[in-house]
Design a protein with these regions (language model features):
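Acidic, metal/ion-coordinating pockets
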Residues: 1-219
């Protein structure tokens, strides 16, 4: 029996609050319509929602952005370099304290103790009404020279993904990667990891209207 799953996604909003009413209206309307048509709907964010170039984000250290994200009911989000590098370590540690969504991140650890951030989880498995297990993993662009200045140590997706595939083997039916890595890395992943089903990309602002199928992986 076939099952339809719809993934709504946002990325690189960069605190463009003037567009938020339209974004929110679209996401909520689209989710309702597709659910009524029988589709399982996931909503995810790909990072760079926060940008301190906007005075409201600057004044609230991104809390105003999280308040808006909360109104959507995201299933999961990851971070971009604007959250990871634009905010101090302390501000990022507090950013998602009142979030009503899960933050997923697999390639950033605290430099001080080597532990992953407390505000993020390495994965999320969502089981649909028909029992399909969807595994969400997430990676952000690993700026190796600048993240350590903020007290974070980034890792390469090329190292982390094989470890995660081994860790979650047999626990999922569909693998979705939330990527703030850029299209070139997304294409590399599709070429080398056919185990991936879908890569939802961001960071480099490429619009793939109908997606791009590489090695059986939908980007």
């Amino acid at each position: 029996m076939q099952e339809q799953v719809t993934i709504l996604h946002t990325n690189d909003l960069h605190s463009h609050f003037e567009n938020w009413p339209r974004v929110q209206r679209y996401l909520l309307s689209e989710r309702t319509q597709r659910q009524q048509a029988g589709s399982t709907v996931l909503t995810v964010g790909l990072g760079d929602a926060v940008d301190r170039a906007h005075p409201l984000s600057e004044a609230t250290e991104g809390q105003a952005n999280v308040d808006l994200l909360n109104a959507i009911g995201y299933d999961a989000v990851t971070i971009g370099n604007n959250e990871g590098l634009g905010l101090t370590h302390a501000a990022l540690d507090k950013l998602y304290l009142h979030a009503n969504f899960d933050v997923i991140l697999d390639n950033l650890t605290n430099t001080a103790d080597g532990q992953p951030p407390k505000w993020a989880r390495p994965a999320k498995i969502i089981t649909t009404a028909r029992g399909t297990r969807i595994l969400l993993l997430a990676f952000t662009a690993p700026f190796t020279l600048t993240y350590p200045l903020n007290g974070w140590t980034p890792a390469s997706v090329k190292t982390r993904l094989p470890e995660l595939l081994a860790q979650y083997a047999g626990q999922y039916d569909v693998l979705v990667i939330l990527s703030h890595l850029g299209i070139n890395v997304d294409r590399w992943l599709a070429k080398h990891f056919p185990q991936i089903d879908v890569i939802i990309g961001s960071h480099t602002y490429h619009l793939l209207v109908n997606g791009e199928l590489k090695n059986g992986v939908l980007i």
